[in-house]
Amino acid sequence: MRLATILSESGRNVATGTSHAVGLALGLAIACGLLSGVDALTVIGLEQDATAYQASAAHVRTVSAPSAVDPDACAALTDSSSVQAAGALVPTEPLIPSATPANPLQAFSVTTSLGRVLGVDAPHPEGVWVSETLAQTLGLSVGGTLGTSDGPLVVAGTFPWPQDGRDSRLGLAVLVPTTVDQRYDECWAAGWPTTGAVDDLLRTVVDVEPQSTEAVTVGQVNTSLGKSFDAHQAFEERPTRFAPWGCAGVGFVLGYWGLRRRRLEHAGARHAGQSRSAQLATASLETAVWAGAGAVVGGSALLVLVTLSGAHDQAAVFRLAAQGVALGALGALLGATVAVSLVRERHLFRYFKDR
């Protein structure tokens, strides 16, 4: 059977509705689109959870050891791939605002590297840092001054510090960046993804005298979202991780059913002299048409879903979701091949009676 004949017969079967291409394509698109869409939304949810975890400063680990934290060692933690930012702080004498002398503000001396941990927006090189909450409460702005009993202080920058479970001390405190060589009380390190290695590294910045009775405490800036967030494990163990294989199964069933229901037609063609290879080629082309169309429709719907979802890495999420519709199309081809391969010419009259 020539290629032109195979192409002509396949096209005729699709055009006349013999292969039920439209219904099978829609079935594949809907089933695989739903399965892959649910998986995509699950992954996007995990991505949003990870973003919220970092935004809440839950990924910031701390070590506390009064007057025993080496600021240089603390800042050097960023040499490790586990830590993206680190800085030290120590409480100092409270500041008395000129406008509200009855309500002193807690103050901290901090290393400049702590700014990256806190997300300080500091366009001015010199001055103090305050939280956005405190700035709003006192009517302060970056570049303005905070009047105190010790004189005016320039507000060099602000940082977000909402009341979401994180260490509340910094919400109404004034942070004074300094380069003075001194020992600090705490070292904060932002590490992502969260691993136990960060805690081990934090302990190395503490220089405790052998006879000291001070406790070294490792903690977390915000404990409200859990001690750790293993994004990789959450992704690998998500309940929808088998969605692509579900799509492959759906495709196989549709491909098999689409050809199995025509076994009388194929057995008759075999009886009339059509070769098995020609029949397989014709069936594969017909299936490729509707499976490809279904994959395109399902993939387009997934693209719209991912685009509208606001996923941080839309390309990666779409590639993951597209695996489902791709496997669905491949499953359909496999199912069709199996169905045609199981047709036997000698069963022609049985197929006729069972039709």
Please place each PLM-identified region on the residue numbering:
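A hydrophobic alpha-helix feature that marks transmembrane segments and, especially
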Residues: D39-A40, P244-A267, Q279
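C-terminal membrane-exit region of the final transmembrane helix in multipass inner-membrane proteins
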Residues: L327-R355
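Basic-flanked hydrophobic alpha-helices used for secretion and membrane insertion
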Residues: L77-Q84, P91-G226
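Membrane-proximal extracellular/periplasmic loop immediately following the first transmembrane helix
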Residues: M1-L3, L46-S109
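Alpha-helical transmembrane segments
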Residues: G11, C32-A58, V338-L342
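Peri-transmembrane interface segments
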Residues: E209-C247, Y256-R260
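Transmembrane alpha-helical interface segments in multi-pass membrane proteins
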Residues: G268-A336
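N-terminal Sec/SRP start-transfer signal
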Residues: M1-L35
